[in-house]
From Swiss-Prot:
Entry keywords, A to Z: Carbohydrate metabolism, Lyase
Pathway: Amino-sugar metabolism; N-acetylmuramate degradation
Active site, per annotation: 87 (proton donor), 118
NCBIfam families the UniProt entry points to: N-acetylmuramic acid 6-phosphate etherase, PRK05441.1, PRK12570.1
Pfam families membership: GKRP-like_C, GKRP_SIS_N
Domain SIS: 59-222
Record organism: Gloeothece citriformis (strain PCC 7424)
Statement: the UniProt record of this protein carries the keyword Transmembrane helix: no
Taxonomy, superkingdom: Bacteria
Gene it is expressed from: murQ
Similarity remark: Belongs to the GCKR-like family. MurNAc-6-P etherase subfamily.
Enzyme class: lyase
Protein name as annotated: N-acetylmuramic acid 6-phosphate etherase
GO molecular function: carbohydrate derivative binding; carbon-oxygen lyase activity; ether hydrolase activity
């Protein structure tokens, strides 16, 4: 990491020429300006597509081998990591330990700013030791400006433990170097409010995390077509979604879909396999396990045998 005391040259700290009269704009002009500037996030994702694709492959393979995915950040970056990690269990029925978000300052920092805690390199290293990171794991360090000591400490400690490391930042490599196996640069330019990286930098970071986690889960077979077939049926909304998925992918009515869902132990993926192959829950579960939980692979295997 570059030893930076002066950060004014960083892309995320620079003055945006398009918003220099920000305090004089009408409400409509403010909305139009935000809309125009946010278009940069799409270009930034496109510019990093190769690195994002490589990261998906690395993460999915690590999770397939029993490893874990950790997001590490401070402030907005940390909160976004925690948010994405928290959404994985209900969306993909993953165990809570599979994808974890780590924020400088811990849970309290989610609701109250703790920016001073991001300056401690040793705290980042310590959290990696506490989570007992192994070579099977992937650690994603998120730092918009690329300089957060907490994140650099975590990445360095993870590398020492031979874990795969991924860095996500919003500054060019010429301004800040980051030691990581995969270096994702999301260049959205100066913020409308100078230095406020909760804006474009935060938006593009969330987009990238959406891509990484969803992409990895797709490759793990937790999606069939574009349906979340591993959805955790934990409330009325998700129960309704589970029924609609079964109905849409079979010829069953809602009552029949409900009966099938219950017989499968409320596992949509298993219910679909049971219906397609005419097998019971135990047989279906065994077949899914044989194919590492991949419904399409299990179905194709059964069809090849017929």
């Amino acid at each position: 990491m570059n030893n930076l005391e002066e950060r004014g040259h960083l892309l995320t700290e620079q003055i945006n020429p398009n918003s220099q009269n920000l305090d004089q704009l009408s409400s409509l002009e403010l909305v139009e300006l935000f809309n125009a500037e946010d278009a940069q996030t799409l270009k930034a994702i496109a510019g990093a597509k190769l690195e994002l694709a490589k990261a998906i492959e690395v993460i999915s393979e690590a999770l397939r081998q029993g490893g874990r995915l950790f997001y590490v950040g401070a402030g907005t970056s940390g909160r976004l990591g925690v948010l994405d990690a928290a959404e994985c269990p209900p969306t993909f029925c993953t165990p809570p330990e599979m994808v974890q978000g780590i924020i400088a300052g811990g849970a309290q920092a989610l609701i109250r700013s703790s920016e001073d805690l991001e300056d401690k390199l040793e705290d980042g290293a310590s959290i990696i030791a506490q989570r007992e990171i192994t070579p099977l794991d992937v650690v994603v360090g998120i730092t918009a400006g690329g300089t957060t000591p907490f994140v650099h400490g975590a990445l360095m400690a993870a590398k020492t433990r031979r874990a795969t490391t991924i860095a996500i930042s919003c500054v060019p490599v010429e301004q800040v170097s980051i030691e990581a196996d995969i270096d994702i640069r999301l260049l959205t330019g100066p913020e409308i409010l100078a230095g406020s990286t909760r804006l474009k930098a935060g938006t593009v970071t969330k987009m990238a995390l959406n891509i990484l986690s969803t992409g990895a889960m797709v490759q793990l077979g937790k999606v069939y077509g574009n349906r979340m077939i591993d959805v955790a049926v934990t409330n009325r909304k998700l129960h309704d979604r589970a029924l609609r998925i079964i109905q849409d992918l079979t010829d069953l009515n809602r009552t029949e879909a409900g009966s099938l869902l219950e017989r499968s132990g409320r596992q949509v993926k298993l219910a679909l396999l049971m219906h397609s192959l005419g097998v019971d829950a135990e047989t279906g579960a065994h077949l899914l396990a044989t194919h590492h939980g991949n419904l399409r692979a299990a179905l194709n295997s059964a069809l090849l045998k017929d």
